[in-house]
């Protein structure tokens, strides 16, 4: 029992810790103690009855909580021992644990509920046993559902669960120890089981299988806490004030396999800024939102509490082999296969599963707010201020009333939350699996809190599961696993390669592009109240995250362009509707709001480019009005934050100058001229002062800046910008290496790039576009740089380690080859691109798609995803299409009626000697 006694003392002391530190500092500052050893004096002082009495009078709330907590802990241990003695024979038979020979009792460090109840770990000579002070009906129900699924014979390996004994409102569970695997085969079976388990939990709408609830035991995962087995969100959602499409997106995410929390949780939809996923949550992560606290200078009068970056606690959820972590990302195919097999078994067992649910008399836990939110309140409430004054403590917790609807049910619910927090407990809500009421803190029922029961929700949800749902979930599993990729992590234990999604493509390039478009449409998020669509996708900010597709040109803008030009060249109206629906989805999700960022690939100029293409292809002049009014609002924001303007092609003024100068030759809008003038002055000022970042390359470096100056100089006739363009070329060419026939990459890693974004191909492309502009038509340096770009593109543009992306992959190489071919009239370069397309289409079918951000799924991103592949295939089939990475502008011929007629993209035709 020594362990429980030690915990007992530590538990009580932790409640008073911050208050005791305040006390010792107050006495130190007031000079109460003459001795130098202030800490020892304080320690002795706090042991006297008189001091304790005064302390209790000063902090009455703390005094009450400590004694209340002590009584609860004694009762908890008593209940545990009584349960063991009362059921010793069943415990021996089920677990082989001898209750007459008990050693230590350890109370878990987890949350306290329902009068201080916590999990207790009991150790003895015969093993270890887990006491749970709540019903284990969810575990028993899951076993029933698991058995039903396994009877179909579709799941290859057993899905073992921890043994349990349930006795009403408490029970006992087998203690599972973490074990490594010894072989790759065992790891494969482990991750197959993860996939299969995730399917069953997904079908039951379980949503709390985070890293603390999984234990790796060799090739078998065990789930040690299923109290939230079935989710019920039949009550009106907290997202009721959100835009309808955003509500639909969040609901789809919650009801997906990722809603179980088993897979990596790197997403913009989750409450935390670190990954709590069941198979991936690791204490190696740090948080910017959440803090960790530790004692410093213990045993001295300088004792204090310091805060640091929040970290996850140690757990047993990560799989190891020979001391190395077996990373789940490399076992995506095993997890997907397990998920598919088990979910197909679920589909075949729907009626039996629903019967099992309907016959259950058990309860499940309802999590009505994130537990971490309650924890934050208790953390604040541990301040001496809230220990002195009960009224202040009640006022603090009453902030939970803020923002709720005014119904009696919600007031009752929050009252129960406040009551639990006042007792230093995390509020605990339960619901019968076949009931609508919720029970708060084991002692108060709120009738008809929900409009349906958890089993009703499962019945409704499981009825919708079909092959299409399974396919969508496998895509999400891939995206989620991709978000866990860490290039700095230790290599894969068994030497595996990252798995890729395979796509079958027709040999006809237009048809192949259309097949990709059809796959995108089939996986789209569909609004319930409109025709709007979007997608889940992988975004890259600091790390890969799951997000909803934006229509920035670097991301979803390419998908809009693909659909528009599929409509142009196939004549199928569904593609025009699809393009319009993506745009309406972006508007509903708030992606089309005016912004100060008027860059091309990440800002407002890209959105204008999309509307421009709608105008060019449909002749609908309302798009011009939309552009005009939108940019006027952007201009206001731009003037409010002029220092936020960046420099480069991707996200800065250079992209703005190239895109808007070209479009305004056709649109002739005053607002564009004003934006161009501000952008040009900003970029010129920074360039002349040497403040632009010293980088080579088109996307982020001198090549893009040179093109921007040249474009604006040609547009305005201002020779200042033509001269600045020439200067930028000269600065970049200082870094040309004759030996490598390439420009040095000035980023940290150094080397020589061979991509659109970095290296000779993109630099040559920028020079190619400068060649037709005023002051550079007969420039020999420009002509020579173009040839250098083509040379490296042909020599290195199809390296074996390249991905398939448009930004820095093989399809970017093909796209640039086509642009070069169009410009110089080279059938040879075009044939090289077409031939390469055939090879890489076959590679995508046989080996899988290599995304541009180490993703494993065919996401709808234009520059890094499968959309870029489809768009490039369309360009190879129809070379007159505008190149996205060259910011080509379709020319518009105005008719006498004021409408527009579209002509093919302007071709930069000239000869290079």
Regions inferred by a protein language model and the residue ranges of each:
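CBM-like carbohydrate-recognition segments
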Residues: 805-807, 825-913
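Hydrophobic residue at the +6 position relative to the catalytic HRD Asp in the kinase catalytic loop
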Residues: 212-214
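C-terminal catalytic region of ATP-dependent kinase domains
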Residues: 1-18, 22-26, 31-32, 38-81, ...
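Low-complexity, Ser/Thr/Pro/Gly-enriched N-terminal "stalk/linker" regions
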Residues: 482-555, 562-565, 569, 573-574, ...
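Well-ordered alpha-helical scaffold segments within catalytic/enzyme domains
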Residues: 263, 497-504, 558-572, 591, ...
